[in-house]
């Protein structure tokens, strides 16, 4: 194995998952009124309902 491959392999195997998550609430997608889509299954069910005339 070459020197470059050894370095890459070491850095990949030594990666840590400890610490704070990188995703932050301030970057979450929100609607213009400030709400977020917390119940997508309900929305999908409502979209598939047949409208009765």
Curated annotation (Swiss-Prot):
Keywords: Sporulation. This is Small, acid-soluble spore protein K. One of its GO terms (cellular component) is endospore-forming forespore. Its main location: other. Induction: Expressed only in the forespore compartment of sporulating cells. GO terms for biological process: asexual sporulation; sporulation resulting in formation of a cellular spore. Belongs to the SspK family. It is found in: Spore core. InterPro entries: SASP_SspK (IPR012611). Residues 1-53 are annotated as: Disordered.
């Amino acid at each position: 194995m070459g020197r470059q491959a050894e370095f890459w392999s070491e850095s990949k195997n030594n990666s840590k998952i400890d610490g704070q998550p990188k995703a932050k609430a301030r970057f979450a997608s929100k609607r213009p009124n400030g709400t977020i889509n917390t119940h997508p299954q309900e929305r999908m069910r409502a979209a598939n309902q047949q409208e009765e005339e």
